[in-house]
Amino acid sequence: MVKVTAACIIIGDEVLNGKVVDTNSTFFAKYCFDHGIQLKEIATIGDDETQIVDTVRRLVKNYDFIISTGGIGPTHDDITYECMAKSFNLPCELDEECKERMRHKSDPEARLDADALKAHYQMATMPKGTNVKNYYVCDDLWVPICSISHKMYILPGIPQLFARMLKAFTPTLKKIYNLDKDPREYVRYFVRTHLTESQISKELKLIQDESTKVSEAIKIGSYPHFGMGFNTVSILGEKKDDSYLKSIVNRVVNNLEGEVISSELENKFSNQES
């Protein structure tokens, strides 16, 4: 069975100072779950060269598929490409293909002065090397997913672009990591109970300890819903263990006065929707 581990780097001072709410990591977490990828870490860091380089080098050593989002714009604090190049000991150069796509899509030379044009082409100045490959996954966009060593994938921080490009990249991603060959698929069940977390903690620990012996991928979680008068138990694991997972569901229902609910209903509860 193919096992792919992943990590996500959210880059931007605007996230750390509360100016922007990060939604890309949530999207990526769901994306990984849907494609049988084991997301192991999410790092949120600022526009700091040392921090970016250190984080990239650490994650690349430990995981298979690392994405970054943010910091590839035209301003002084957009340093992601430069830092990624440094992380892999590569030069950072103007990419002619990206530059030509910019010209074709928006004709910047006809509408920008020299200083603005230089800043604009900063967005096409990216890592260069034999281990670098740019994937132009959307025909109407000039920005690529920049890949280094089939490990690091650099995406824009704008949520709409991030989501669209990642979705479009899926067929290529499956080929790179052989995700269609004996794929790892995850399933998750939810059980609602009016018992408190203190009342269910002992039973959940017993279930988790027993489940780990079956598969380390099985995770039992408890999620309180403040002011709603109930909690939700999550049972997550691989599809190959579905029969065992369903036995856990029945155990939780019977032992913790629970009822099975859909993921859609659980999402409503999590978002405090009535």
UniProtKB/Swiss-Prot annotation:
Annotated InterPro entries: FLAD1_M (IPR056596), MoaB/Mog-like_dom_sf (IPR036425), MoaB/Mog_dom (IPR001453)
Phosphoserine modification, residue list: 263
Keyword Phosphoprotein included in the entry's annotation: yes
Note: Present with 3890 molecules/cell in log phase SD medium.
Pfam families hit by this protein: FLAD1_M, MoCF_biosynth
An annotated Gene Ontology molecular function: FAD diphosphatase activity
Keyword tags: Phosphoprotein
Record-linked PANTHER family: MOLYBDOPTERIN BINDING DOMAIN PROTEIN (AFU_ORTHOLOGUE AFUA_5G11210)
Biological-process GO terms, alphabetical: flavin-containing compound metabolic process
Descriptive protein name: Uncharacterized protein YMR178W
Keyword Nucleus: no
A single cellular component GO annotation: nucleus
Highest taxon in the source lineage: Eukaryota
